[in-house]
């Protein structure tokens, strides 16, 4: 009998979203006629835009010809997509990113979870609290976190509380962190950061030889001027930061699977002996060993997102979701809730009513309003007493959900 990786036994009892699904299923079985409105997990509801559909149809037909068939593609991504990403997502910001610094993948969740594999198992990890669970759980699996305490925190993790009192801006740790996870626009709080704050993080990383893992999956939802769209807007960030982007929420690719990670050539790590090593080269070795690449058809669809018509159609979808966010935000405010986010992100973070715990509030919404959201405590101890709602639902469902909640 083979021994197991016992670090998996240190994981919390259940991943957040399966637990939500379990509770909803139990309620549905007992109340089969109930119309449940789901504003929990951040899955999109609008269809893929026409420009992307047309591009994928054309690519599929191309694959059906002798001259246009594509088998295994380049693991890092086809040049046509790499070039579009570099020119549109970074060139438009005045940031120069080379094609060789971009790696196309099947999702930011995978990238955020897999990137830790190239770092030492004794690397000190810092995460905000609340936090996207994948950042923590993958490091638990790798054995970096130690044991979980009664307060829900792992003994070897550095937790950086993001609270109402500090404007949901995690404070730079006083101790040295090797790897720092940052997410802006933030999941779950829906808040954003400033260039000044990012500059301070870059300075900290340089001083401590740290690497920042910057999750920017919701960048396309930024609406206010002056809000940074990339950490590379800060001078020197290429020397200390990796950035994650995704087509999932931006272009509705949750069912198609396409994202990318940017690892600048300037970024270095160290061996135990002090030798500098290219992080780009390390990730390239890992990526090409474990991943065969995103399909040609999907990458042609992703490329179409950058066409003039594709951009127009995608912006319309984003506007639809952000209109939902405004409805949720304003509706909850009128109902007396304290709310955050929902301006530059598709998530609304609210304080639970009557000092209920996050899960008790979940049960109340499900039982009394048949509305499903996400308990804040599922994102970390500092999320206790808070709740996340997603703007990715259908307009009519969002309006009905807010009406139901308002009558509680």
Swiss-Prot record:
Binding site for substrate: 15, 42, 109, 132, 187, 292, 388
Modified residues (N6-(pyridoxal phosphate)lysine): 249
Key word Transferase present: yes
Pathway listed: Amino-acid biosynthesis; L-lysine biosynthesis via DAP pathway; LL-2,6-diaminopimelate from (S)-tetrahydrodipicolinate (aminotransferase route): step 1/1
Top class in the EC scheme: transferase
UniProt GO molecular function: L,L-diaminopimelate aminotransferase activity; pyridoxal phosphate binding
Cofactor(s) needed for function: pyridoxal 5'-phosphate
EC number: 2.6.1.83
Gene Ontology biological-process annotations: lysine biosynthetic process via diaminopimelate, diaminopimelate-aminotransferase pathway
Residues holding pyridoxal 5'-phosphate: 72, 108-109, 132, 187, 218, 246-248, 257, 292
Swiss-Prot/TrEMBL catalytic activity: (2S,6S)-2,6-diaminopimelate + 2-oxoglutarate = (S)-2,3,4,5-tetrahydrodipicolinate + L-glutamate + H2O + H(+)
Gene3D superfamilies: Aspartate Aminotransferase, domain 1, Type I PLP-dependent aspartate aminotransferase-like (Major domain)
Matching CDD domains: AAT_like
Annotated keywords: Aminotransferase, Pyridoxal phosphate, Transferase
Family that this chain belongs to: Belongs to the class-I pyridoxal-phosphate-dependent aminotransferase family. LL-diaminopimelate aminotransferase subfamily.
Subunit: Homodimer.
Its job: Involved in the synthesis of meso-diaminopimelate (m-DAP or DL-DAP), required for both lysine and peptidoglycan biosynthesis. Catalyzes the direct conversion of tetrahydrodipicolinate to LL-diaminopimelate.
NCBIfam families referenced in this protein's UniProt entry, alphabetically: DAPAT_plant
Protein name: LL-diaminopimelate aminotransferase
């Amino acid at each position: 009998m083979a021994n197991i990786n016992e670090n998996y036994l240190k994981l919390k009892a259940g991943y957040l979203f399966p637990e939500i699904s379990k509770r909803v299923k139990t309620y549905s079985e007992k109340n089969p006629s109930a119309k449940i409105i789901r504003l929990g997990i951040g899955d999109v509801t609008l269809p893929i835009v026409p420009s992307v559909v047309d591009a994928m149809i054309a690519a599929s037909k191309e694959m059906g010809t002798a001259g246009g068939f594509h088998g295994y593609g380049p693991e890092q991504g086809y040049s046509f997509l790499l070039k579009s990403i570099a020119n549109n997502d970074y060139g438009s910001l005045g940031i120069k990113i080379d094609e060789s610094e971009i790696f196309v993948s099947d999702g930011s969740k995978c990238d955020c979870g897999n990137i830790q594999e190239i770092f030492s198992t004794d690397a000190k990890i810092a995460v905000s609290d609340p936090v996207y669970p994948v950042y923590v759980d993958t490091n638990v699996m790798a054995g970096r976190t130690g044991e979980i305490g009664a307060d829900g925190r792992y003994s070897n993790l550095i937790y950086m509380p993001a609270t109402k009192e500090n404007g949901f801006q995690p404070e730079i740790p006083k101790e040295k962190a090797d790897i720092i996870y940052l997410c802006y626009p933030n999941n779950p709080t829906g808040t954003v950061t400033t260039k000044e704050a990012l500059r301070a993080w870059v300075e900290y990383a340089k001083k401590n030889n740290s690497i920042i893992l910057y999750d920017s999956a919701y960048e396309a939802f930024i609406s206010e001027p002056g809000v940074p769209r990339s950490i590379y807007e800060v001078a020197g960030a290429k020397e200390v930061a990796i950035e994650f982007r995704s087509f999932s929420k931006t272009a509705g690719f949750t069912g198609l699977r396409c994202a990318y990670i940017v690892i600048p050539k300037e970024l270095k790590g160290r061996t135990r002996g002090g030798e500098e090593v290219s992080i780009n080269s390390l990730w390239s070795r890992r990526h090409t060993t474990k991943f065969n690449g995103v399909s040609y058809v999907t990458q042609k669809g992703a490329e179409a997102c950058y066409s003039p018509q594709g951009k127009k159609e995608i912006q319309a979808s984003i506007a639809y979701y952000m209109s939902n966010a405004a409805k949720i935000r304003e509706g909850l405010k009128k109902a007396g809730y304290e709310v955050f986010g929902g301006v530059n992100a598709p998530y609304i973070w609210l304080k639970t009513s009557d000092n209920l715990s996050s899960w008790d509030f979940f049960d109340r919404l499900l039982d009394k309003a048949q509305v499903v959201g996400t308990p804040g405590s599922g994102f970390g101890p500092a999320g206790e007493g808070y709740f996340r709602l997603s703007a990715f639902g259908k307009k009519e469902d969002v309006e009905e959900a807010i009406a139901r909640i308002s009558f509680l």
